[in-house]
């Protein structure tokens, strides 16, 4: 296994243009597929998860061309459901492709097999399958119940009313929302229990609106969608920068001294993870916002105790930022870390302890208490892009850090370590 060693580094300075949002890229690709008309998508993320979606669309007969090193996609919409008769789709570990495609493929008439990497077959999908079965879909598990691989025999999606659990992943609700306008009749989706990661549902609703479909949102407890609609291509659409990816650079400035301006996200962003900068500000960092940029500057950081369910991915960056704060930091209501690319609560706690930090790992929280001197450690990344990027920040201590398998960042940010080197002094 290859590794890289970073630091020790003293300052972080510069300006960064972050790549397109993973969450938005895969949502927009699917909506453009179902829409009437040709869509030109710019600032598309060029990464493994997006390639898995594009490869699947190719197998399903969707026509598109890529330009600008894969960051511009011109896609011919189908003006309705996917018409393929059969598809054997390998989706890697891309939840943003697996979940929405599972629902969208139910709209047509074919037979489809959806599978992925071993970790994908450990990530639950039962709540989504239960909801689709309640809407009349013939969908079965090829392996263990509640987990992929899945086999779908599609015959359209009936309307009516369906309940879906909201406490594991908002992607299950996103999947049904995006397919609901093409259902045979109006659909009311009721959320059973607390809905995690509400900002990701806002991303979905915003993207649907860009393609001409409005959803009645009843305080995130129910959603009403008219059936037998057709998405309309907006012609050209730009994917905003990935707010989770911005978090590492903003945190670097807050930790290290210097000033970093991140372009691609700001006050105009639809992503909830831009609120990460507010958390940094509460810890003491100097933060300035523009419509499409955020700037961070160092100040003395203090530990915080906070519910971070609204920024689950970016909250991981707070766990390593906590190493540089005064006093303990507790990140709460993050059970869904456990069903991501790896069990992130376990992974973060394990690797932080290697550095010498005092860590408490709860069922749905983590407490990190910093120590005066961090240990040099080799950080295992669990094939999880965000673990690798989070722990790069340790390089701004007095101790170098070794990151094992740094190539795992190809899932969402293949050029991360190149850009990291441009801001590091």
From Swiss-Prot:
Top-level enzyme category: transferase
CDD domains the record matches: EPSP_synthase
GO molecular function term, any single one: 3-phosphoshikimate 1-carboxyvinyltransferase activity
InterPro entries reported for this sequence: Enolpyruvate_Tfrase_dom, Enolpyruvate_Tfrase_sf, EPSP_synthase, EPSP_synthase_CS, RNA3'P_cycl/enolpyr_Trfase_a/b
Reaction(s) the record says it catalyses: 3-phosphoshikimate + phosphoenolpyruvate = 5-O-(1-carboxyvinyl)-3-phosphoshikimate + phosphate
GO terms for biological process, alphabetical: amino acid biosynthetic process; aromatic amino acid family biosynthetic process; chorismate biosynthetic process
Keywords: Amino-acid biosynthesis, Aromatic amino acid biosynthesis, Cytoplasm, Transferase
UniProt-annotated binding residues for phosphoenolpyruvate: 22, 95, 123, 171, 344, 386, 411
Protein name, as recorded: 3-phosphoshikimate 1-carboxyvinyltransferase
